[in-house]
Amino acid sequence: MDRGSFSPEELTEFVNLMQVYEGAMYEISTKLEILDSEFQVRFSHDPIHHMERRLKSVNSILGKLKRKTLPVTVSSIKDNLFDVAGIRVICNYRDDVYSVSNYLSAQNDISVLRVKDYIKNPKQNGYRSLHVIYAVPVFLSSGAHYTPVEVQFRTIAMDYWASLEHALRYKTDLPDAKLAEPTRLRCISYAVFCLKK
């Protein structure tokens, strides 16, 4: 099969798969909204500042398959890509990040597939966030489909830093000297980390 696109048969299967990923994303999102609401009512505390949801675009999915030198098939997406559906949970404080993540992880109808804690172990460029991949059941007429959703938990300050770092890295009109500031970015990241203890 051509590695650049889906066959006509797989295109229909791909559209159906994306509907399942969207359902999984909304399932996790609803669980998070319920947890946030409970915290507001019971504890007068709003741990989630806001959430952002997204499904990877077709081009992003195809690009990731190519970078990983994987075949462009629906099976390859199901077996190898765990971030097609994603939610970013922006919390007020670092303690909120872990509390919300732990309460969500404890729910008995979802499974934790993978955890990468870039808060305790930041990336070399200073990036901090807690990434958890969950498998959540999506109930369709054909039955339950356990589907992965990547949830990135971070504080407002960590989110601001990640946005700034992303803009600096991918902004094309910056001189090379501006792009080569990893030490400065790590220092900013550490300062942001200390702000929201």
Named regions from a protein language model:
Residues 1-25, 29-38, 150-181:
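An acidic, glycine-/histidine-flanked metal-binding catalytic module
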Residues 17, 21, 25, 58, ...:
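Generic alpha-helical secondary structure
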Residues 24-29, 33-70:
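Surface-exposed, low-hydrophobicity interaction/linker segments
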Residues 40, 73-82:
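Short, flexible, solvent-exposed loop/turn segments with mixed acidic/basic and small polar residues
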Residues 68, 84, 94-97:
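Surface-exposed peri-terminal alpha-helical interaction modules
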Residues 78, 91-181:
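Long beta-strand-rich cores associated with HINT superfamily self-processing modules
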Residues 86-90:
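Terminal, regulation- and interaction-focused segments at domain boundaries
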Residues 182-197:
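Positively charged, low-complexity/disordered segments
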